[in-house]
Amino acid sequence: MTPHLPTSLTGSTSVRLAFATAAVLSMLGGTAEAEEGGTGHYLPGSMASSIDSAPAKESFLMRLNVVNYDGSIGKNQPLPIAGLTAVGVDAKSTGVGLTAVWRPSFEIGEGWSYALTATLPYVWLDVSADVGAQGLAVRRSSSVNGLGDIVLQPLLINQNVNPDFNINYRVSLYAPTGSYEVGRLANTGKNFWTVEPTVGFMYFGQKNGIEASTFVGVDFNRTNPDTDYKSGTQVHVDATLAQHFPWQGGLVGLGINAYYYQQVTGDSGAGATPGDFKAKTLGLGPVASFVGKVGGHDLVSELKWVHESSTTNRLKGDLIWLKVLYKFY
């Protein structure tokens, strides 16, 4: 039986995991990659597969994303967190994000379509770390929950090259809407703006069921006005290779997800006391998906686990993602 990909995965449905970005990374108001607090707005691995593609036809979509992260960094690596210098950082977080995607009816050219998205993240975060001068550090803990940094995507363009291949062009804006306090280990927001252009290349064979997707993005960060800390520019590459096959009237996909993250410019500002603090990391793990119909409309779900390795100047840990997307029309 030849697998047939529903329109929700050929480019007519999609949402981005940016909310997970806000849901997990934003909530790590100081704990995860490099940059201030050891984390940026973008969560590596958040855009990596066809479920993160852009709509090619008129549609309205909603997606629920649930992300769990558990990471730590050793006591030999100091992290700048909300005006503090911390070592031995442990962070556990859960983020729930709701993303709305609207693709209007008008076309911008043959094979080209436009959409826009907005994401509301809610996060729970627990952070513990040793804070203070060397030899006098005190173990501190902080827990917080609330609205994270909202993600707006005013520009999301899809180029339908052929039935099997699409290219996405998008610009995301991370707004500092989450809670932030200087001197608090856990914050639901980053307290600065980020602009993130991304290009995604998605191949999905309508006859062979093979998926090969790659997303390349760059994050440009503004200065945190409360700490005078400007996080450096980051480049991230995320990819998925999967095989999809018919099952129970739908499509099942099994494959692997990988990402590479590299900070390409150093941190700056009066608050960047640890220096330029560049970071990098590599992640790899399995991914499974299912596409079916509910109420006559496409329902897409994806579950994946990503394990981090080869990590420098950021937390190292594991992420578990669950994404559920529903196409209303």
Residue map of PLM features:
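Cleavable N-terminal export/targeting peptides
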Residues: 1-42, 329
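Short loop/turn motifs that connect adjacent beta-strands in outer-membrane beta-barrel proteins
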Residues: 35-36, 51-59, 71-73, 105-114, ...
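Surface-exposed strand-loop-strand hairpins of Gram-negative outer-membrane beta-barrel proteins
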Residues: 35-41, 70-95, 131-143, 185-186
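Outer membrane beta-barrel transmembrane domains
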Residues: 38, 75, 82-83, 226-329
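Transmembrane beta-barrel strands of outer-membrane/channel proteins
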Residues: 40-43, 62-70, 116-122, 169-175, ...
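Residues on the lipid-exposed face of transmembrane beta-strands in outer-membrane beta-barrel proteins
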Residues: 53, 64, 98-104, 152-158, ...
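Residues that define the transmembrane beta-barrel architecture of outer-membrane proteins
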Residues: 58, 90-98, 112, 144-151, ...
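Long, hydrophobic/aromatic-enriched structural stretches that serve as scaffold segments
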Residues: 86-153, 160
